[in-house]
Amino acid sequence: MKILVDAMGGDNAPLCVLQGASQAAAEFGDGMTLTLLGEEKAIRDCAKENKIDLAPFEIVNCTENIDMHDDPVKAVRHKKDSSLVKGLTMLKNGEADAFVSAGSTGALHVGTSLIVRTVKGVKRPALATPMPGAKQNFLLLDCGANVECRPEMLNAFGTMGSVYAEKVMGRTAPKVALVNNGAEDTKGTPTYREAHQLLKANPCIHFAGNIEPRYIMDGEADVVVCDGFVGNVVLKLTEGVAKTLLGMLKKIFLQNIITKLSYLGIKGGLGELKRMMDSEEVGGAPLLGAAKPVIKAHGSSHAKGIKNAIRQAKLCVANDLCGTMEKALGEVAAQKEEADA
């Protein structure tokens, strides 16, 4: 199994990418080859300065780089020798089994759609992120790939998310909910009102209706659908609230000797809460619907986030996620045809 890693993508590249890749190679590298893509001199200089052993890796030199300010479409079309575009091209050509990048979400989405393509039945891949819930974790999509969506796309996300929840997460009859500013059918923008009706009429999913943002984290729904703008806001707001809340609790427990002693009694529980809310534990979000595994790591990922994104890529390949998705979507399409007949 060969996994490509974009060494130049993300706010903390290449150092944190190299550190994360090194940890991945050490912890679960058996049967896996990691290939780093990026400016070879920068990679080697960084590794030397930080005493990182590059022996476990192959390095593919790239002379260009796509940054967060580049126009995604122009960057993918014109920066052919960037680590992101070269990685996706190698993946398409069968030179690797998966690609991991913490780089530009827009460029990765455009590049995946234009280069790697999508499985049959999917027009636009969506970023799907497992999120922690009070009762159980749930899948949130889209988390940033498609900022503007037509109602039909939101309906397709519901189908894709339902398939993923059933086939990968092991959920039986997964509940699908649509993020909205109210539970009533008439709430939301025209796009969301129409999407609600499409999801409600979709014979291939179990639609639970609209869900208000304050109830998302309850974990009642297995799949939560929204456009990429809303999903990215939900994702980053959740991360920010968790970080702030944990910081506030820490200040409270450090006030005096009594609060410090109280902290010792619940230290384990707080540690588990912190782990649950840590985005780096998940590592990255698969571009659901891509023809081959493409994992988007958080742009601010540190070593642990990169390591876990690589772990997720390995699991996707081992479990044939893309093949399973295509097969399941074929079954869904057949069910729809039967229902329409």
Question: Which ranges hold each PLM region?
Answer:
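Glycine-rich phosphate/nucleotide-binding loop
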Residues: S113-A126, P130-L140, E220-V224, G228-E338
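N-terminal charge/polar-biased segments
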Residues: M1-V5, D11-L15, G29-G31, R44-D45, ...
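Glycine-rich phosphate/diphosphate-binding loop of Rossmann-like nucleotide-binding domains
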Residues: L15-C16, F28-T35, K41-R44, N50, ...
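Short, glycine-rich nucleotide/cofactor-binding loops
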Residues: V5-L15, A145-N155, K296-H302
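Phosphate/nucleotide-donor binding subsite
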Residues: K51-A96
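Short beta-strand segments
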Residues: D6, L37-G38, V60, S101-G103, ...
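Short glycine/serine/threonine-rich phosphate/pyrophosphate-binding segments
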Residues: A13-V17, I43, D81-G94, A98-T112, ...
